[in-house]
């Protein structure tokens, strides 16, 4: 049976899975679950992921719902090149270290930045208090600095001389604030050079394909009132 991936490329972890699968020629059937239409909240999608979140994966009768778990499953099952998730214990531990750190730090601040700058005011028509936006951008700056100083340092990639899962997860996170109009790479030459290396390692065409939605997100139309009412209870937690 064909591997099934339930994705919306608006979502940063969905983009990471999409890039990884495409780059490694992993055959899959993609089901687009449109977050801005509330399709992830449907009873039909709840049969795939009861938590009603993307990404999700079905491999025959086996389902998996967390992005890092899906990436590791694909890396193990399809025997991808070693640099993605190295066999070397310490190199693998560095990938794991980044994946463990980013979930409540860089991912959170990148997500909040996009929502505070674009999704709430443009898509949902809800204004964010200036002091809240300022705090969000300050938090983003702190986490980007940690990424640069603690993880990237002076290496070509986050874990060494070759691209890994850590780099794909990190770059897809950073493209969220980029899509929201934040110049996160300006004034950061090491990070900007890393960005160019990741884009080249992935392939520019695939990189742009995966990020087409997020790079056009500021042009999204306002939400339908019914959709807005459906989405608001879940997304309000992002501005607390």
Swiss-Prot record:
It is found in: Cytoplasm. Keywords: Cytoplasm, Transferase. Residues 2-82 form the GST N-terminal domain. One of its GO terms (cellular component) is cytoplasm. Signal peptide: none annotated. The keyword Cytoplasm applies. Transmembrane segments: none annotated. One of its GO terms (molecular function) is alkylhalidase activity. Glutathione binds at residues 40, 53-54, 66-67. Residues 88-223 form the GST C-terminal domain. Disulfide bonds: none annotated. In liver, highest expression found in central vein limiting plate hepatocytes. In lung, expressed mainly in club cells of the bronchiolar epithelium and, at low levels, in type II alveolar cells. InterPro entries: Glutathione-S-Trfase_C-like, Glutathione-S-Trfase_C_sf, Glutathione_S-Trfase, Glutathione_S-Trfase_N, GST_C, GST_C_Theta, GST_N_Theta, GST_Theta. It catalyses: RX + glutathione = an S-substituted glutathione + a halide anion + H(+). Its EC number is 2.5.1.18. GO terms for biological process: dichloromethane metabolic process; DNA modification; glutathione metabolic process; response to salicylic acid; response to selenium ion; response to vitamin E; response to xenobiotic stimulus. Homodimer. PANTHER family: GLUTATHIONE S-TRANSFERASE THETA-1, PTHR43917. Belongs to the GST superfamily. Theta family. Conjugation of reduced glutathione to a wide number of exogenous and endogenous hydrophobic electrophiles. Also binds steroids, bilirubin, carcinogens and numerous organic anions. Has dichloromethane dehalogenase activity. This is Glutathione S-transferase theta-1. It comes from Rattus norvegicus (Rat). The lineage of its organism: Eukaryota, Metazoa, Chordata, Craniata, Vertebrata.
